[in-house]
């Protein structure tokens, strides 16, 4: 049997949830990239690309929502440290015929990583796209939200395989 209390940093020796103490960790440059897809009808993608959505510029709204969400991650995820982010970028790329790819990059000089901020940015950007387009396509699917890479800190560099970075079907 695996002792998960030893493997999971947010669980103490009694099995209770806790916020990890990072005060002794050195300040280093931390960067994370996450991505996700919103799969939709081809007509919905055309509407977004043409800027014809009734609620306005879908991609601009989703970018801003993703950036705002990254900045609020510590408020949304209970055991996540509140961080002063030095940079957040969210890009949204239409991928013919039926999806958009969202990529978020988060950066800070700090004692803990920014993976949750990047993942939160992608998630909220995807939800914003869904919200703005649901009147014409309730069957949209938010899919494959994953950490693409992270660097900085004791655990070093992580990179998902390059083939997972492209706009592609499952």
From Swiss-Prot:
Pathway: Cofactor biosynthesis; molybdopterin biosynthesis. GO terms for molecular function: cyclic pyranopterin monophosphate synthase activity. It comes from the Bacteria. Gene3D superfamilies: Molybdopterin cofactor biosynthesis C (MoaC) domain (3.30.70.640). It catalyses: (8S)-3',8-cyclo-7,8-dihydroguanosine 5'-triphosphate = cyclic pyranopterin phosphate + diphosphate. One of its GO terms (cellular component) is extracellular region. The active site is at residue 131. One of its GO terms (biological process) is symbiont-mediated suppression of host innate immune response. Its EC number is 4.6.1.17. Homohexamer; trimer of dimers. This is Cyclic pyranopterin monophosphate synthase 1. It comes from Mycobacterium tuberculosis (strain ATCC 25618 / H37Rv). The gene is moaC1.
């Amino acid at each position: 049997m695996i002792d998960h209390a030893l493997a999971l940093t947010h669980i103490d020796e009694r099995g209770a949830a806790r916020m990890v103490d990072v005060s002794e960790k050195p300040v280093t440059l931390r960067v994370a990239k996450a991505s996700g897809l919103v799969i939709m009808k081809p007509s919905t993608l055309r509407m977004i690309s043409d800027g014809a959505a009734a609620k306005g510029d879908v991609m601009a709204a989703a970018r801003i929502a993703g950036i705002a969400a990254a900045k609020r991650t510590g408020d949304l995820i209970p055991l996540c440290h509140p961080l002063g982010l030095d940079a957040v970028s969210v890009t949204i790329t239409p991928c013919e015929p039926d999806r958009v790819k969202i990529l978020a990059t988060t950066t800070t000089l700090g004692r803990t990583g920014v993976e949750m901020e990047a993942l939160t940015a992608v998630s909220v950007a995807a939800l914003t796209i869904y919200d703005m387009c649901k009147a014409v396509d309730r069957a949209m699917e938010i899919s494959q939200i994953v950490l693409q890479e992270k660097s900085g800190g004791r655990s070093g560099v992580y990179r998902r395989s390059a083939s997972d970075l492209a706009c592609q079907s499952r």
